[in-house]
Design a protein with these regions (language model features):
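Glycine-rich, highly charged phosphate/nucleotide-binding loops
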Residues: 8-14, 65-81, 87-96
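NAD(P)-binding Rossmann-fold cofactor-contacting core
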Residues: 36-38, 45-67
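A charged, well-structured terminal subsegment
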Residues: 141-155
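ADP-ribose/adenylate-binding Rossmann-like module
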Residues: 102-125
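Short acidic, glycine/proline-enriched helix-loop-strand junctions
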Residues: 80-81, 119-142
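Short N-terminal or domain-adjacent regulatory/targeting segments
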Residues: 2-24
Length: 155
């Protein structure tokens, strides 16, 4: 994967940019994953895992336990195997540090969840060749192509 020339992270992402990411990534490390089924991160992890992505939960508060049968890691560095995408369920101010960790482990994509964006993190990741998505949910984007036909049918 090659990084986009420049993307304004305050605007909509081109549909083909998001589609390419979601088609090409196989392994996703979710920073801020929760074992609490009432948390949004749990639902997103569940759907992405059931869709076929190799999900790796990362949460220092739950390290060593399991979420949906998946081992939880303390940090990205602790994973010890290739990761295509780092998805972030943390506050915007945590993103630059997570971007540095994503770069260090050789991730190809940094994806920040809805409501999470940070220009410094975007610049760091893009300068290192990562694709960057901010303020978007991969679960929503994964199913977006199906919305329009259904809406047109009144479903």
């Amino acid at each position: 994967m090659t990084a986009a020339a420049h993307i304004d992270h305050d605007r909509d992402y081109p549909a083909d940019y998001l589609a390419t990411i979601l088609k090409e990534v196989k392994t996703i490390a979710m920073v801020g994953a929760s074992s609490d089924p009432t948390k949004f991160s749990y639902g997103v992890l569940r759907v992405l895992h059931e869709t076929g992505y190799d999900m790796i939960p990362v949460n220092p508060n739950e390290a060593g336990s399991e979420i949906r049968g998946l081992r939880v890691y303390e940090s990205l560095a602790a994973i010890g195997r290739p990761v295509d995408m780092v998805q972030v369920f943390r506050s915007s101010d945590a993103l630059p540090g997570i971007a540095r960790e994503a770069i260090a482990i050789g991730a190809k994509v940094l994806w920040a969840q809805l409501g999470v964006r940070n220009d410094e993190a975007a610049r760091l990741a893009e300068a290192a060749g990562l694709k960057v998505v901010m303020n978007r949910c991969p679960k929503i984007e994964l199913f977006r192509p199906f919305w329009k036909p259904r809406l047109n049918q009144g479903i």
